[in-house]
A protein has these predicted regions:
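Gram-negative bacterial Sec-dependent N-terminal signal peptides
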Residues: 3-21
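N-terminal leader/targeting signatures
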Residues: 1, 9-11, 182, 196
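C-terminal and inter-domain tail/linker signature
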Residues: 22-278
Length: 278
């Protein structure tokens, strides 16, 4: 009886461990699931909804919480919706994607998903209208390199961006910009931005507006893989509460490229869930 019990216990342990191992996805598998789920907004294919966990937390303030909110969005997207993922990377349980949308009009967006095992359990995003034209340096919000490289430098590049935000963006030490950014090879994709300048240094477009207020107040997440690092922050833009998603490409421990999406955070009485933007 003891031997039989031991065999049964070992068998159950094997099944349990096997199920746990089966639930773990590789970074490539997570990326594939996110790409497929995003594409379902265009195709209205409901099968990718199986990737979503029952505890799914939604931070898009215009979408209802839980799996039901995503299902409704897939079933009834704005007419003519298209989704093309331009850049995507995985960082632990997170996958971050930069997307070219037609979603009630041409838009650019970042989507961030958190996995628990093989299920997607949380989502953040930021969406912005496409620029009417390329910026003063001739760049769009999406062009530029897309390949993830320098995988061995992931941690160092994330730390670089943390220090940059601590020192320069939040700390206001503008004299330290040169420590973090290429002086003559920084490609800027912000609608009003110019190469070799940050928003703090730009004086054209909306940045030239009298009384213009542009301020970061808090960094919520720093995600990265290889040469790409995404910083998710909040602050004020044109004196309005704003979510900032800034994507940087790092080369030789310097910022060499920047893409961003800015979205005004609506008043809480307009939210369709109570989870907050971050």
């Amino acid at each position: 009886m003891q031997k039989r019990f031991t065999v049964c216990a070992l068998t159950m342990l094997s099944i349990t461990c096997g199920a746990a191992l089966a639930a773990q996805l590789t970074p490539a598998q997570r990326i594939d699931r996110v790409t497929t789920l995003l594409k379902s907004l265009e195709t209205r294919d409901l099968r990718p909804l199986a990737y979503i966990g029952s505890s799914y937390t939604q931070h898009n303030l215009q979408v209802a919480d839980g799996p039901a909110g995503v299902r409704e969005l897939v079933l009834h997207p704005p007419a003519g919706t298209t989704v093309h993922t331009v850049r995507i990377f995985a960082d632990g349980d997170y996958v971050a994607a930069q997307n070219d949308y037609n979603f009630g009009g041409p838009k650019v967006g970042f989507d961030v998903f958190r996995f628990d095992g093989d299920k997607i359990v949380e989502h953040w995003d930021n969406l912005q209208d496409k620029c009417a034209a390329p910026n003063p340096s001739g760049r769009t919000q999406l062009d530029g390199p897309t390949k993830v490289t320098d995988f061995d430098k992931t941690d160092a590049n994330k730390l670089l961006m943390k220090r940059y935000f601590d020192d320069v963006v939040l700390g206001g030490q503008r004299d330290k910009i040169a420590q973090y950014r290429s002086a003559d090879n920084f490609h800027q994709h912000n609608c009003d931005g110019e190469d070799n300048k940050s928003g703090f240094q730009t004086k054209t477009g909306i940045f030239a507006k009298p009384g213009f207020v542009f301020k970061y107040t808090k960094v919520h997440k720093i995600l990265g893989q290889g040469n790409f690092v995404l910083v998710m922050s909040e602050g004020l833009f044109d004196a309005k509460p704003t979510a900032f998603y800034d994507l940087y490409r790092i080369e030789n421990s310097k910022q060499v490229e920047h893409w961003d999406v800015l979205e005004t955070i609506p008043p809480s009485d307009q939210w369709k869930n109570s989870n907050g933007k971050f």
